[in-house]
Amino acid sequence: MIKVITGMRRCGKSFLLFELFTSYLENSGVSSDHIIKIDLEDYKNRAMRNPENLYTYVESRIVDNNLYYILIDEVQMLDDFKDVLNGFLKMRNTDVYVTGSNAKFLSKDIATEFRGRGFEVKMYPLSFNEYMSAYTGTPQAGLNEYMLYGGLPQILSYETEDLKVRFLKNLFEETYIKDIKDRYNIRKDQDLEELINILASGIGALTNPNKLANTFKSEKKSAITQDTIKDYIDHLCDSFLIEQSTRYDIKGKRYINTPFKYYFMDLGLRNARINFRQMEKTHLMENLIYNELRIRGFNVDVGVVPVITINKEGKQQRSQLEVDFICNLGSKRYYIQSAYRMESDEKIKQERAPLLKVDDSFKKMIILGEETPVTRDEYGITTISIYDFLLKDNALEL
């Protein structure tokens, strides 16, 4: 069975495979010559990107009937990798693990080519809890740093702001953007660059390709089509830079095709992209909560609750209230509001309103961006601090 570890660049896939897993195997008694490690991103291994060369090399390393562990990093750099992996599957004494940084070429293939013979393990940047295990300051200072520079493991090795900023900017430009341009042969890259800026400036905002195309036309004087914008967004999603969250009609029990919300999988990369401007903590916290829920394995949608209100003329009108997150994992479901501050009765009423219109028995929560005790009001709505949510594994059950 093929085990595929997917996730964004520099989130720790290689370290997991080549260091932690290799150490585990050796400590379990596996001989080092039965662990075949190939890093396809390493220039000295460029010849291995040819399927014939790679297959021949692995075949030459297998000299007995004992089990061999084949570990391949950045497998999407291998031409015709599906054929090669299928070849390894036919060997009776191999156990294959690969990593990859492009969902289009990996997740889809696992679901089709390797159905029943492979599974995907999604890897994310460090959670805040993991981040704090290596951070020496207070949770409050740690959260500020985490929201500013993100959770890529390497960021913790830099001691100065300048080094952190340079690392993130260089990673975005020289790795992510270059990879997308090269992989999809994008020559007119100005629109792609501008699209990334727009999405980074509007995290958590509802939008769609048609709306974005109109923005390009009116503000950027660009004739880019909505189909091209959709392709570019797909490329960004496939590279694990952003994720799309779909709206769900809670009462109608159906998905709404458009518009969508887009969240950056690492806030540090998002912030570096826009030169650490537009640092509204309301939006950063919403993105942070989304990421934490995804790390915990939840499917996360945007909730829509249709309501009827009375306008100033006394007439009924239809409108919609929004639940920030509907989180589903197996039989579990939670409705969650993100509120950086609730300093007035009006703000409390505003955050509660969508949750009160949800008439099922699943748990309803407000996550507050400051320290506060866990409370449950007369409507059954739990309020919890962002620190408890991020640092306690059982936070959703409090």
Where are these regions (language model features)?
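A cross-kingdom feature that marks ATP-driven nucleic-acid transaction machinery
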Residues: 1, 6, 15-16, 22-23, ...
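Short glycine-rich substrate-engagement loop in P-loop NTPases that contacts/grips substrate
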Residues: 36-65
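Conserved ATPase-coupling elements of RecA-like P-loop NTPase cores
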Residues: 47-50, 76-85, 108-110
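Conserved P-loop NTPase "ATPase switch" module shared by AAA+ and STAND
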Residues: 63-81
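Short regulatory helix/loop adjacent to the ATP-binding pocket of P-loop NTPases
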Residues: 87, 104-119, 134-136
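Interdomain hinge/linker elements that couple catalytic modules in large macromolecular machines
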Residues: 124, 129-306, 318
